């Protein structure tokens, strides 16, 4: 949901995250200055969380805070029983963690850098030669699409519609660091530029059989800007995951297990579901209030969610993981 361009929902999420951050800072400060965590009014904190269920901005929430030893110092959950009638929400509930997958993928990349397998200034084409000749899209006037999108006046009128796009050659080398910093030029189908978004949606990237097919489809699409020119949120970390795979000869799923979850004995973070894993429904805030998502409503790159099946062989480093709080 954080990838949708929904102003009302964004306001809810920003305010929610501010309040949760305040809670986290309070607990962090207390735990650093005392041998025991002091909670003077747990009900007041619970009420703060519940408010986001009651006002319709969230379908469910789980807040789980731990100290540095891994002991929980606060936990609370709530849900909209009409939207989630049959599932209990607790530390063992499996969530699609969406863009939090990016942190895991980047951590693996930095681990590979430490091992001398990757360098941050390596060209991406060293590992993904299919992207060496990728093109760059401009507005029909030949100006930058990122500049067009970031101009608020362009959201209010179709007078300066940038379509049809002008396609030019890539002028700079794309690097691994640019993938990490979202400066490589990739995007989601949420730019608001129909001729750009529709091209990505038609490719249905999430329906690729594996990362090779994903790259084959992606390489036909233009970048939204020259690599290194501006940061723009999108599929950059997903491509970074493929770099990790190509550099090691292992799948991203294997890399997560070998370098993170198994050494650290983490059981609640993975790609594919287990046999008995039940995922929560997918929700949308398209109407400025949370509800069950309609088919294709979260259409950020074609099919609106990655595959989570046991036999899935496509691992999205930017969107595809599932996890629990515990």
Identify what each model region corresponds to:
Residues 30-31:
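C-terminal motif of bacterial Sec signal peptides marking the signal peptidase cleavage site
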Residues 6-9, 13-16:
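Short hydrophobic targeting helices and cationic amphipathic motifs
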Residues 18-23:
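Sec-dependent signal peptide recognition
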Residues 49, 69, 96-124, 237-245:
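Active-site SXXK
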Residues 1-3:
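Methionine residue identity
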Residues 55-57, 88, 119, 168-173, ...:
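Extracellular/periplasmic catalytic domains that process cell-envelope and extracellular macromolecules
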Residues 39-95, 117, 133-140:
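Short, conserved catalytic-motif segment at the N-terminal edge
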Residues 134-326:
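Short, surface-exposed loop or secondary-structure junction motifs
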């Amino acid at each position: 949901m954080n990838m949708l361009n929904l102003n009302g929902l964004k306001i809810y999420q920003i305010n929610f995250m501010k309040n949760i951050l305040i809670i986290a800072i309070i607990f962090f400060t207390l735990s650093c200055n005392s041998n025991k965590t002091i909670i003077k009014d747990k009900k007041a904190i619970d009420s703060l969380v519940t408010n986001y269920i009651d006002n319709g901005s969230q379908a469910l929430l789980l807040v789980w805070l731990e100290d540095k030893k891994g002991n929980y110092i606060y936990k609370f959950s709530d849900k909209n029983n009409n939207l989630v009638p049959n599932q209990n929400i607790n530390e063992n509930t499996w969530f699609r963690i969406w863009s939090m997958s990016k942190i895991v993928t980047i951590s693996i990349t930095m681990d590979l850098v430490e091992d001398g397998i990757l360098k941050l200034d390596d060209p991406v084409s060293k590992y993904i030669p299919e992207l060496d000749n990728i093109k760059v899209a401009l507005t029909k006037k030949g100006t930058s699409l990122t500049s067009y999108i970031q101009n608020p006046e362009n959201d209010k009128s179709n007078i300066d519609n940038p379509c049809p796009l002008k396609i030019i050659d890539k002028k700079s080398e794309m690097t691994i660091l640019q993938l990490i910093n979202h400066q490589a030029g990739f995007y989601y189908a949420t730019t608001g530029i129909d001729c750009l978004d529709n091209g990505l949606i038609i490719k249905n990237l999430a329906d690729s059989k594996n990362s090779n097919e994903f790259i084959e489809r992606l390489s036909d699409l233009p970048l939204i800007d020259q690599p290194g020119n501006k940061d723009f949120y999108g599929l950059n970390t997903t491509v970074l995951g493929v770099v990790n795979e190509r550099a090691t000869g292992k799948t991203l799923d294997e890399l997560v297990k070998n370098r993170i979850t198994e050494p650290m004995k983490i059981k609640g973070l993975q790609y594919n579901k287990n046999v008995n894993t039940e995922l929560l429904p997918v929700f949308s805030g398209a109407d400025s209030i949370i509800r069950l998502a309609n088919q294709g409503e979260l259409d950020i790159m074609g099919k609106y969610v990655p595959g989570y099946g046991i036999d899935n062989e496509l691992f999205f480093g930017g969107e595809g993981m599932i996890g629990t709080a515990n």
